[in-house]
Amino acid sequence: MATIDPLAEILTLLQPMARFSKQVACTAPWRIYRDGTGEPFYCAILEGSCRIAFGTGPAVVLLTGDFVLAPAMRALRIESLDTPPDLPANQPEKLGEGLFHVGRRDGPTDLRMRIGHCHGA
């Protein structure tokens, strides 16, 4: 019997299409806050790890290869694993079309992610 992949089943049914997408490179420590928009949100971790939380929910650690699909984005906090509690939120710096950087300008990139908003087909 074939193993059923629940995420693949959901994606097949919803057929989401990216309305907005960007690739973000991050250098620790960093933190991003976003207000809830109510739009479907996705995040794919291409390389590295981070911590993500929606609204007042618990934070979850994401690793390379992890994918998050939120049907209606609430307030979002996403940050490096070593972020001090008092670090203010960073504003992503646009490097080029669809390419952004967050965190220190020096040092190695510790996270690459593809994030954006989507809608059903």
Predicted regions and their residues:
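Alpha-helical transmembrane segments
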Residues: 13-19, 117
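N-terminal regulatory/effector-sensing and dimerization cores
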Residues: 25-121
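Short amphipathic
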Residues: 19-25
